[in-house]
């Protein structure tokens, strides 16, 4: 991990198109501004972890759930059959 010390108004450049600016420091809180292209997703760590957890939960589908979906599909003829 690279550790840098910056003062209010100073910046850090990442790559060619991401700039982080220290805007304000109050006690143990630091307010930063981030300039980045729209396609770069920027999340606070706690939101990233929550999103990751939700994605894992959403991907956990039981075989019975899948069978139920397939049975409800009118074109489904069962395993080993062709349509």
Curated annotation (Swiss-Prot):
Keyword Repressor: yes
UniProt record, GO biological process: bacterial-type flagellum organization; mRNA catabolic process; negative regulation of translational initiation; regulation of bacterial-type flagellum assembly; regulation of carbohydrate metabolic process
Gene Ontology CC terms: cytosol
Keyword RNA-binding in annotation: yes
Cell location: Cytoplasm
GO terms, molecular function: mRNA 5'-UTR binding
SUPFAM superfamilies, per database record: CsrA-like
Matches recorded under InterPro entries: CsrA (IPR003751), CsrA_sf (IPR036107)
Broad class of where this protein is predominantly found: cytoplasm
Keywords: Bacterial flagellum biogenesis, Cytoplasm, Repressor, RNA-binding, Translation regulation
General function of this protein: A translational regulator that binds mRNA to regulate translation initiation and/or mRNA stability. Usually binds in the 5'-UTR at or near the Shine-Dalgarno sequence preventing ribosome-binding, thus repressing translation. Its main target seems to be the major flagellin gene, while its function is anatagonized by FliW.
Family listed: Belongs to the CsrA/RsmA family.
Known partners and oligomeric status: Homodimer; the beta-strands of each monomer intercalate to form a hydrophobic core, while the alpha-helices form wings that extend away from the core.
Protein name: Translational regulator CsrA
Protein source organism: Thermotoga petrophila (strain ATCC BAA-488 / DSM 13995 / JCM 10881 / RKU-1)
Recorded name of the encoding gene: csrA
């Amino acid at each position: 991990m690279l550790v840098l010390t910056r003062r209010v108004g100073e910046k850090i450049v990442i790559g060619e198109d991401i700039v982080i600016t220290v805007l304000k420091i109050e006690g143990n809180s630091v307010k930063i501004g981030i300039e980045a292209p729209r396609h770069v997703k920027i999340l606070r760590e706690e939101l990233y972890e929550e999103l990751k957890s939700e994605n894992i939960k959403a991907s956990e589908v039981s075989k019975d759930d899948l069978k139920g979906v397939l049975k409800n599909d009118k074109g489904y003829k069962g395993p080993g059959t062709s349509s």
